């Protein structure tokens, strides 16, 4: 039996009848029991970068170039590119950036592709 708070006690499903006797021996009655708990989880990419630092869109959304051409662009074409510095950008954004500068936009280290794709 795990106590979360002084007023709340979680009781596993099989121990409900034995805990009635135990709780009757306690002088202070509990306010409520949790009989069922449905946990919810959220899945996310295991990367620290949530937004592309160049276009400021979420890294898993379309970049601004693909949003402008949304009729012809698909999410498969708008992929993520990682550098050896572990910074991630939309491939279209970093490609445009690399035409003028061969460095990472965030740490100014020489850019080299580490990984490309979803």
Curated annotation (Swiss-Prot):
The keyword Nucleus belongs to this UniProt entry's keyword annotation: yes
Tissue: Widely expressed. Expressed in shoot, siliques, meristem, flowers, floral buds, open flowers, leaves, stems, roots, germinal seeds and seedlings in dark. Expressed at a higher level in tissues containing actively dividing cells.
Modified residues (N-acetylalanine): 2
Chain positions recorded as Zn(2+) 1 binding sites: 52, 55, 90
GO cellular component terms attached to this protein's record: cytoplasm; nucleus; SCF ubiquitin ligase complex
Binding residue positions for Zn(2+) 2: 63, 66, 78, 92
Location relative to the cell: Cytoplasm; Nucleus
Annotated SUPFAM superfamilies: RING/U-box
Segments forming RING-type zinc fingers: 63-108
Pfam families recorded: zf-rbx1
Residues binding Zn(2+) 3: 85, 87, 104, 107
Pathway noted in the entry: Protein modification; protein ubiquitination
InterPro entries membership: RING-box_E3_Ubiquitin_Ligase (IPR051031), Znf_RING (IPR001841), Znf_RING/FYVE/PHD (IPR013083), Znf_RING_H2 (IPR024766)
Keyword entries, A-Z: Acetylation, Cytoplasm, Metal-binding, Nucleus, Ubl conjugation pathway, Zinc, Zinc-finger
Assembly, per entry: Part of SCF complexes, which consist of a SKP1-related protein, a cullin, a RBX protein and a F-box protein. Part of a SCF complex with ASK1 or ASK2 and CUL1. Part of a SCF complex with CUL1 and TIR1. Interacts with CUL1 and CUL4. Component of the CUL4-RBX1-CDD complex.
PANTHER family: RING BOX (PTHR11210)
Role: Component of the SCF (SKP1-CUL1-F-box protein) E3 ubiquitin ligase complex, which mediates the ubiquitination and subsequent proteasomal degradation of target proteins. The SCF complex plays a crucial role in regulating response to auxin and is essential for growth and development. Through the RING-type zinc finger, seems to recruit the E2 ubiquitination enzyme, to the complex and brings it into close proximity to the substrate. Promotes the neddylation of CUL1.
Family: Belongs to the RING-box family.
Domain notes: The RING-type zinc finger domain is essential for ubiquitin ligase activity. It coordinates an additional third zinc ion.
Name this protein carries in UniProt: RING-box protein 1a
Organism per entry: Arabidopsis thaliana (Mouse-ear cress)
Source lineage: Eukaryota, Viridiplantae, Streptophyta, Embryophyta, Tracheophyta
Gene name of the encoded protein: RBX1A
């Amino acid at each position: 039996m795990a106590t979360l708070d002084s007023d709340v006690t979680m009781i596993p499903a099989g121990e409900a009848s034995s805990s009635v006797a135990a709780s009757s021996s306690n002088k202070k009655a509990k306010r409520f029991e949790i009989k069922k708990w449905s946990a919810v989880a959220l899945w996310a990419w295991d990367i620290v970068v949530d937004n592309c630092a160049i276009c400021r869109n979420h890294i898993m959304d379309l970049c601004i170039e693909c949003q402008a051409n949304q009729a012809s662009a698909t999410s498969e074409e708008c992929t993520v590119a990682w550098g050896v510095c572990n910074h991630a950008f939309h491939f279209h954004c970093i490609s445009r950036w690399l035409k003028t500068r061969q460095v990472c936009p965030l740490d100014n280290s020489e850019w080299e592709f580490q990984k490309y794709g979803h």
